[in-house]
């Protein structure tokens, strides 16, 4: 399994090329490739991120995004959702996953969903779409001590589950 995040190619043009080369090698060897888009505006512009992620998409099997990355990088937003107020429309994200799949032909699209209750309390869940079925996780109420690493934990759990041979459910 080869996993990278959108932070990696944002670190410089040479790093983008190295990332592309690593993806090409992994693809040739039949290694599954996943990417957590993880857009960071301090590292690159929306347009640069969109261009790079589009170029890398031909190698990626599983894409992982959050609601903001889907909109910012891929230009695909869920109806009846407002990230700033924490309002979330789960069914709208099923449509987001389908649109991302249609546009880029990934084998799986995973989306982390965060419904903000307050600055320190969120409901977290995720979805996985495989082109046939969209599965939603249980909703987990989370008291946030530090936001860093939530998406990484989600990606690690998905990869672990796939490597163990667990089915999507």
Describe each region flagged by the PLM.
Residues 135-169:
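Conserved post-catalytic alpha-helical subdomain immediately downstream of the catalytic base
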Residues 1-134, 140-141, 166-167:
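Ribokinase/PfkB-type carbohydrate-kinase core domain
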């Amino acid at each position: 399994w080869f996993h990278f995040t959108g932070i990696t190619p944002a670190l410089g043009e040479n790093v983008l090329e190295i990332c592309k080369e690593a993806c090409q090698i992994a693809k040739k060897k039949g290694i599954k490739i996943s990417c957590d888009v993880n857009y960071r505006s301090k590292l690159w512009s929306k347009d640069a991120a969109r261009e790079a992620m589009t170029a890398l998409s031909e190698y990626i099997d599983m894409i992982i995004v959050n609601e903001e990355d889907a909109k910012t990088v891929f230009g695909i937003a869920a109806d009846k959702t407002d990230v700033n107020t924490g309002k979330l429309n789960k069914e709208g994200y099923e449509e987001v996953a389908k649109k991302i799949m249609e546009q880029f032909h990934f084998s799986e699209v995973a989306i982390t969903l965060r419904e903000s209750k307050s600055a320190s309390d969120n409901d977290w869940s995720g979805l996985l779409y495989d082109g046939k079925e969209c599965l939603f996780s249980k909703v987990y109420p989370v008291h946030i001590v530090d936001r860093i690493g939530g998406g990484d934990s989600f990606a690690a759990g998905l990869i672990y589950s796939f490597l163990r041979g667990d089915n999507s459910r």
